[in-house]
C-alpha cells in the first residue's frame, strides 16, 4: 500500500535513523522530485522534531541551509519534509581514503565559516559542529556546503535586544566529544566561540586523518570524555598543527582567546585561509578531492579498457599469423571460422589460458561510478558512488539524506 505524507509526498524506503527520528527517501508527487522525510513518533519521551523544524524555518533563505518543504503530523508521527542533499563530509572523507588535500580543506573552511556565521546571525549556536553535519548539495548545487542538524542548537541571545545568555558553569557536555571545545569539556556554557573552535578541530581532522584524542579507551562514557578532555588540553596547538601552515594554529589560538560573549571576527578568519589559498597558487575552481578522484578513476578505467583491447588484438595476431595485414572484415571472417573448435580443457601450454584478458570487475565498477559521479567538472558525489568504494552503512541522522546518506540528528551524532 502506498504511504503518503501531507497528501503530497510518497514515503519510500528508510535510509537512516537517529536517536529521535527515522529518515526516509520520499517523492514529491506534484513536482516529481525526491525529498527527505524525517519521522518522529508522537509518543516519544522527548519530542524534538517540532523544535528542530522551527529552527530550520528561522534559518530559511540562507546559503547552505536546506529547504523545509512541509511540516506537520501524520497519524502517529511528527513529520518534516526537506530538500534532499548529497553525502556528508565524513562520507566524502572516507571516500577519499581519510585524507583531504590542503586545497580541499581550505575550500571547505571558507564555506563552513560562513555557514556558522549565518547561524550565529540568526541568534543561534549550533553546538554540534562535525563532518557528519555538513553535506554537499546535489546537481547544480553539488559544490555548495550545507549545514544540517539543529537538534542541539540553542539561542544564545535575544533576537530583539541581542542580550547575550549568562555565563554558566557545571554544564554537561553537549555535542560530540571529539570536536568539543575545551571550555565545553570544562562544563562552561557554550557560545559562538565554541562552534568555531570545534570547526578548527574538524579542519585539522581533515588535514591529519585523525585527532590525537581519538581511540582512547575507558570503562564509562564519562571517563572517556575525561580522557579526551585531558589529551586535548595537554596537546599544544602548535603540536596539533605541526607540519601544516601556521594559519591553522593562528585560527585555533584566535578561537581560544575569545571571551564568552565576544562576537568572533568571521571575516578575519575567512581571510586568513583565503590568503593562504592564494599564496599556495590554488584556483577557486571548486574541484574538490572527490572530483579529482573521480577523474582519476575514469581515466584509469579507460586506460585499462584500451590496454585490454590492445592485448586482445596482439593475441589474435599471435594465434592467427595470416590475419596480419587483412582488412578488418576479412580478419573477422577468418577469426570466426577458426574459433569454431571443440571445447577442450586448456592446458598449461595454451597461451590462451595465460594471456586472454578478462575485465577487472573492480575497475569496471570504478568506471561506472565515475560515469555517474561526474558529468562535467566539478559535480557532486552520490551516496551510491560512495558505497561502491566502501561500506557506508553508517548514517548520520539529523536531517537530510542522500540516496544512502542522511543529514542527521545525532545517534552516531552524540558521541
Curated annotation (Swiss-Prot):
Annotated signal sequence range: none
Domain Protein kinase per the UniProt entry, residue ranges: 9-277
Free-text description of this protein's post-translational modifications in UniProt: Autophosphorylated on serine and threonine residues.
Composition skew (Polar residues), residue ranges: 380-415
Highest rank taxon of the organism: Eukaryota
EC class: transferase
Name the UniProt record assigns to this protein: Casein kinase I isoform delta
Catalytic activity reported: L-seryl-[protein] + ATP = O-phospho-L-seryl-[protein] + ADP + H(+); L-threonyl-[protein] + ATP = O-phospho-L-threonyl-[protein] + ADP + H(+); L-seryl-[tau protein] + ATP = O-phospho-L-seryl-[tau protein] + ADP + H(+); L-threonyl-[tau protein] + ATP = O-phospho-L-threonyl-[tau protein] + ADP + H(+)
Activity regulation information from UniProt: Exhibits substrate-dependent heparin activation.
MF terms in GO: ATP binding; protein kinase activity; protein serine kinase activity; protein serine/threonine kinase activity
Gene, per the UniProt record: csnk1d
SMART domains: S_TKc
Tissue and organ distribution: Detected in retina photoreceptor cells.
PANTHER family: CASEIN KINASE-RELATED
Segments of skewed composition (Basic and acidic residues): 301-315
Region (Autoinhibitory): 317-342
UniProt-annotated stretches for the region Disordered: 301-415
Induction of the gene: Constitutively expressed in retina.
Family to which the UniProt record says this protein belongs: Belongs to the protein kinase superfamily.
PROSITE patterns with a match to the protein in the record: PROTEIN_KINASE_ATP, PROTEIN_KINASE_DOM, PROTEIN_KINASE_ST
